[in-house]
Swiss-Prot record:
It catalyses: L-galactonate + NAD(+) = keto-D-tagaturonate + NADH + H(+). It is an enzyme of class 1 (oxidoreductase). This is L-galactonate-5-dehydrogenase. Its EC number is 1.1.1.414. Its cofactor is Zn(2+). InterPro entries: ADH-like_C, ADH-like_N, ADH_Zn_CS, GroES-like_sf, NAD(P)-bd_dom_sf, PKS_ER, Zn_alcohol_dh. Zn(2+) 2 binds at residues 92, 95, 98, 106. PROSITE patterns: ADH_ZINC (PS00059). Optimum pH is 8.0. The gene is lgoD. The lineage of its organism: Bacteria, Pseudomonadati, Pseudomonadota, Gammaproteobacteria, Enterobacterales. It comes from Escherichia coli (strain K12). GO terms for molecular function: oxidoreductase activity, acting on the CH-OH group of donors, NAD or NADP as acceptor; zinc ion binding. Pfam families: ADH_N, ADH_zinc_N.
Length: 340
């Protein structure tokens, strides 16, 4: 077989099947037969035409697990038949960020499935620098290494230590991942979300304390969880302006806020509150190879699992016909994976 099925987002709200030649891996590339692909908010927003800096047509999908079925030249440490996850961030390796090891915020970053074609296809050729061995991990779990890695990067940015009291605001996939990883790192974790369904999901899957940030006594409830104090570290995964503006009110003096959720606008908070607490506030973008490696290790150890965030599975063969109904309009969806 020399051709493959590819699902292309031709334009907003239009997914079409096409046949393409199976790519031939170039030097320092591996050909991957796709096993599973996670569905991200990026894939949903791109379908709706709401993803900035996005061009059509595009093959979506950047949370990828597959099996190596072909290797280019100059590759010694990978082999055919090996299961791998894809690190979708292709960095230039030349800008100041890359040279300082922060390839996650490369000035010229190109993301597989966003800026170049991704995993909604049967095969994909990937630079070997963007491959993480994932043998021994369930393929659906391995497809979720990427979102877990984003969570791991936020936890690393927060410099969370064992025993620290951490509040995660927002119980979508990234917030769930951050809570799970902070817990695995030994922190005392509380999760806040306004959605009853998401709070129930966290209570069932992660067995962590849950709070409703819209409750009138939210401050008192938070202090009750942390022995009378506010949080030492807050990770905000909401991307919600009001929630992000309020984070400075949720940390104790000397506390840290990390924004891993993105709001496409301006934020505003009390400067006196910010200063008197000597707040450390930072953003968290994408993930580095070190974050991917940590997630792979935690999955292999059973400390984080796909079931912590995964709620739905979709067969690739019928995705064009079911995407709008079962993904876009599915109010119960927290995290979905495409199976091949």
């Amino acid at each position: 077989m020399s051709t493959m099925n590819v699902l292309i987002c031709q334009q907003p709200k239009e997914l079409v099947w096409k046949q393409r030649e199976i790519p031939i891996p170039g030097d320092n590339e591996a050909l991957i037969k796709i096993k599973s692909v996670g569905i991200c908010g990026t894939d949903i927003h791109a379908w709706g035409g709401n993803q900035p800096f996005f061009s059509y047509p595009r093959v979506l999908g950047h949370e990828i697990c597959g099996e190596i079925v072909g290797l280019g030249k100059n590759i010694a440490d990978l082999k055919n038949g090996q299961q791998v996850a894809v690190i979708p961030y292709v960095a230039c390796q030349q800008c100041p960020a890359c040279k300082s090891g922060r390839t996650n915020c490369c000035e010229k970053i190109s993301v597989i499935g966003v800026h170049q074609d991704g995993g909604f296809s049967e095969y994909l050729s990937v630079p070997v620098a963007n491959i993480l061995p994932a043998d021994g991990i369930d393929p659906q779990a391995a497809a979720l290494i990427e979102p877990f890695a984003i969570s791991a990067h936020a936890v690393r940015r927060a410099a969370i230590a064992p025993g620290e009291q951490v509040l995660v605001v927002g119980a979508g996939p990234i917030g769930l991942g951050a809570a799970a990883i902070a817990k695995a790192d030994g922190a005392q974790v509380v999760v806040a979300d306004t959605s009853p369904a998401r709070r129930e999901h966290v209570a069932t899957r992660l067995e962590l304390p849950l709070l409703d940030p819209s409750a009138e006594d939210f401050d008192a409830q938070l202090r009750a969880q942390f022995g009378g104090s506010l949080a030492q570290k807050v990770i905000d995964a909401t991307g919600n302006q009001h929630a992000m503006n309020n984070t400075v009110n949720l940390i104790r003096h000397g506390g840290t806020v990390v924004f891993v959720g993105l709001f496409k606008g301006e934020l505003q908070f009390s400067d006196p509150e910010f200063h008197k607490k000597e707040t450390t506030m930072m953003g968290s973008r994408n993930a580095t190879p070190e974050d991917f490696a940590k997630v792979g290790r935690l999955m292999a150890e059973g400390k984080i699992t796909a079931d912590m965030m995964l709620t739905h599975r979709y067969p690739f063969a019928t995705l064009a016909e079911t995407y709008e109904r079962d993904v876009i309009n599915n109010r119960e969806l927290i995290k979905g994976v495409i199976t091949f």
